[in-house]
């Protein structure tokens, strides 16, 4: 009890000291403060440096205008950061376990990872490449994010209500993929294209039968928006030639109902350096062009629904002969080794760049559609797919530089931006009139690039992010493995200007998307008892007072709760060999009050956000005493948020002991603690008086804080009653301890209330009558 009072006094002294320090600084001579001119001079900054800093600076407490979602490459995650500040906000765990979010550690998230098992094997990593935001009428709606795994052909669904991965689907017929994810205008379907050809379904065939037995393809995953899940039963694929299919895009507006997919290595070359053959890179770049696949996906969906498919591994596949008969797939020559097919915002044009060509090609959808309608074909490929002549489909070719790769669009009509990998530049150009307008050097070897809403019907302009493959000398050296470099570029004027370099320290990002921050509406808490991976209330939801430990044979099940600053139960007793299941519910309602849980030496880990229920399991196969504690700092008494798992050895015979401390608290101690509770309640009443005297209901964050403070204070009634009950019996030791718990709940309520009071003061609240 005395230690608790001591902590309170120390906190009070710290607060008073901080206020005094601020007052001294305010009263200090102005000579101690540097002027902007002095800072600029001392750091050797130019006027352009200062302007760039001002353009990217987001003041403390303020937020970015845009939020970017970047693939995380080998990290298997998605990186979230703000634009223009370029501050990293979060890594979203997707395809591999991640301990901070406890993804792959609790049973609920393990179930999501298990969805991504292939051939009965756990796949514990992923190579994320191409994220796609859900769309409504061709523009981002901020509801869902999709991301692919190139290494193991899979797609994942992330719900942007809480930035958690909800589903993983493994492609049932592909052995690899690269071109995913891309969404249709209203997110009816998500495209996933195969990359390296292989027999569909996973069968074996020798490379000598590459042309006959190896195939490419594209899968259209049906998305059920109401459930927020991909529906395998309503999804289908098209069999395609063994060209290496790459990236895709859906048509927009004028080209609605169609999709477009790149390819490379249309030579169908098979390497083999060890056999004395030239490598893949030589044989796969022999031709001057590769093939763009133009697919009538709406008609294909009808064909699949009509049952004109072959079932492979339980999946509907429209075979090539059916696609030809139904008029679903058409080919057009494209610049060789492309990586990106990008439909313009109005859907009238498609731009494609080949890394081995210095031009970007602009195709006219009107010309393509006219050729299809008139059956104006130059011939057929070896598999019978009709080919539209390049000249028939082409609008213009624009020389941009060496290694053109990926294109995104500006809010200004006709303006596009293309990455130039070899030149290490970004090109700004007019795709309607076929003119190069500007080029800007970047650092170094740009891959993809991203503009704000740049692949939608309504690009926002303002900023471009260059996703560079090499950083070389741009950052502090950290060893041979360098961070990646994302460079922010101002595209608001007629000339591009470089603003900022952002190191990306984990994984090699590929593609990114950026959305207006105002379109994202993430929650800050769950309904109490939520299984966050399914969105449903868990059958293991536990309220205060419902905590229990149950045994059935050698199975021990614990239903517990987490709240500042204790884990209930605090003692878990099991026998060696028991299978232990612990269901925990975070009872907090306050924003950002996450709790963690771990059991020493048993590889148990979990993260519980406010309202979440999740489960951890382990077999108590080692006897001994194993502490557990909250791994997320949550309060002044965080270190005291602890407990023990006692694993009794086989054959152990219990000994009677007394848990009561030798030093007993007295009536005087009890009365001191009660006095502290009364004084604390007076502070709370004063804070409540201030808040209710303001227009606090106009501030949603304050309303949430008030609700949480009220709930925390409500918890105090239980220990208060127990303290009074024990005191009435003359058991002042127990009464003092329960009074201390009563005070703990008061302190938490006061802390939340003071946060609400500060928020109102800083955000201009007004008195009400």
Where in the sequence are the language-model features?
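Amphipathic, heptad-repeat alpha-helical segments
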Residues: 662-718
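C-terminal amphipathic alpha-helix
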Residues: 663-687, 724-769
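Bacterial N-terminal signal peptides
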Residues: 16-27
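Bacterial N-terminal signal peptides that target proteins for export
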Residues: 3-18
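Extracellular/periplasmic metallocenter environments
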Residues: 545-546, 608-664
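Predominantly soluble domains enriched in secretory-pathway, periplasmic, or organellar proteins
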Residues: 33-548, 617, 753, 761
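Histidine- and aromatic-enriched segments that form or immediately flank copper-ligand environments
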Residues: 167, 583-613, 636-644
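N-terminal edge beta-strand
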Residues: 549-579
């Amino acid at each position: 009890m005395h230690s608790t009072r001591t902590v309170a006094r120390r906190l009070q002294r710290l607060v008073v000291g901080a206020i005094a320090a601020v007052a001294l600084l305010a009263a200090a001579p102005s000579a101690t403060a540097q002027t902007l001119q002095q800072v600029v001079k001392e750091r050797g900054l130019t006027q352009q440096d200062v302007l760039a800093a001002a353009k990217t600076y987001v003041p403390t407490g303020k937020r970015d205008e845009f939020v970017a979602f970047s693939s995380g490459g080998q990290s298997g995650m998605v990186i979230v950061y703000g634009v223009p500040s370029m501050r990293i906000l979060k890594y979203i765990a997707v395809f591999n376990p991640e301990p901070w979010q406890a993804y792959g550690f609790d049973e609920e998230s393990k179930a999501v990872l298990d969805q991504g098992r292939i051939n009965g094997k756990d796949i514990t990593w992923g190579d994320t490449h191409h994220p796609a935001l859900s769309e409504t009428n061709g523009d981002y709606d901020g509801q869902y994010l999709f991301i692919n795994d190139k290494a193991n052909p899979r797609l994942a669904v992330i719900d942007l209500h809480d930035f958690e991965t909800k589903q993983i689907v493994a492609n049932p017929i592909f052995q690899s993929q690269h071109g995913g994810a891309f969404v249709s205008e209203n997110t009816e379907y998500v495209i996933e294209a195969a990359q390296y050809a292989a027999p569909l379904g996973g069968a074996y065939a020798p490379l000598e039968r590459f042309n006959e037995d190896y195939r490419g393809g594209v899968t259209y995953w049906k998305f059920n928006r109401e459930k927020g899940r991909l529906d395998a039963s309503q999804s289908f694929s098209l069999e395609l030639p063994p060209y290496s299919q790459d990236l895709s895009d859906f048509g927009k507006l004028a080209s609605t109902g169609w999709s477009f997919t790149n390819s490379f290595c249309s030579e169908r070359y098979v390497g083999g350096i060890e056999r004395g053959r030239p490598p893949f890179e030589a044989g796969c770049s022999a031709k001057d062009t590769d093939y763009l696949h133009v697919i009538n996906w709406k008609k294909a969906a009808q064909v699949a629904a009509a049952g004109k498919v072959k079932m492979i591994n339980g999946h509907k596949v429209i075979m090539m002969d059916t696609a030809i008969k139904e008029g679903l797939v058409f080919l057009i020559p494209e610049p060789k080794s492309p990586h990106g097919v990008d439909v313009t915002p109005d859907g009238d044009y498609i731009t494609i760049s080949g890394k081995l060509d210095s031009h970007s090609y602009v195709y006219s959808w009107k010309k393509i559609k006219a050729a299809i309608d008139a059956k104006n074909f130059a011939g057929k490929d070896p598999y019978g797919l009709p080919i539209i002549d390049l000249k028939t489909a082409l609008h213009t070719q624009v020389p941009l530089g060496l290694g053109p790769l990926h294109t995104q669009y500006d809010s200004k009509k006709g303006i596009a931006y293309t990455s130039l990998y070899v030149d290490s530049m970004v090109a700004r150009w007019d795709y309607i009139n076929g003119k190069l307008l500007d080029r800007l050097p970047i650092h170094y070897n740009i891959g993809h690039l991203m503009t704000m809403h740049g692949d939608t019907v309504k690009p926002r302009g303002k900023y471009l992010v260059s996703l560079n493959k090499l950083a070389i000398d741009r950052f502090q050296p950290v060893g041979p493995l360098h961070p990646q470099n994302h460079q922010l570029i101002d595209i608001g004027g007629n000339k591009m200007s470089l603003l900022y370099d952002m190191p990306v320290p984990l994984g090699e990002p590929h593609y990114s998307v950026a959305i207006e921050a105002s379109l994202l509406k993430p929650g800050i808490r769950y309904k109490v008892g939520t299984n966050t991976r399914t969105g449903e209330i868990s059958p293991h939801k536990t309220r205060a007072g419902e905590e229990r430990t149950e045994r059935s044979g050698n199975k021990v099940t614990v239903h517990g709760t987490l709240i500042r600053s204790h884990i209930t139960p605090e003692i878990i007793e099991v026998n060696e060999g028991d299978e232990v299941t612990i269901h925990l519910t975070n009872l907090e309602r306050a924003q950002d009050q996450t709790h963690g849980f771990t059991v020493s030496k048993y590889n148990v880990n979990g993260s519980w956000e406010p309202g979440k229920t999740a489960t951890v399991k382990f077999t108590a196969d080692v006897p001994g005493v194993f502490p557990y504690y909250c791994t997320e700092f949550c309060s002044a008494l965080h270190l005291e948020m602890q407990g023990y798992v006692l694993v009794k050895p086989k054959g152990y015979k219990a000994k009677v002991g007394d848990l009561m401390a030798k030093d007993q608290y007295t009536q005087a101690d009890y009365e001191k603690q009660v006095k502290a509770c009364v004084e604390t309640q007076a502070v709370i009443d004063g804070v409540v008086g201030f808040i209710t005297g303001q227009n606090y209901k106009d501030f949603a964050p304050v309303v949430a804080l008030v609700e949480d403070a009220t709930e925390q204070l409500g918890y105090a009634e239980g220990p208060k009653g127990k303290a009074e009950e024990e005191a009435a019996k003359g058991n002042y030791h127990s009464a003092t301890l329960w009074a201390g718990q009563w005070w703990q709940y008061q302190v938490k309520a006061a802390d939340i209330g003071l946060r609400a009071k500060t928020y109102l003061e800083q955000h201009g609240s007004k008195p009400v009558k």
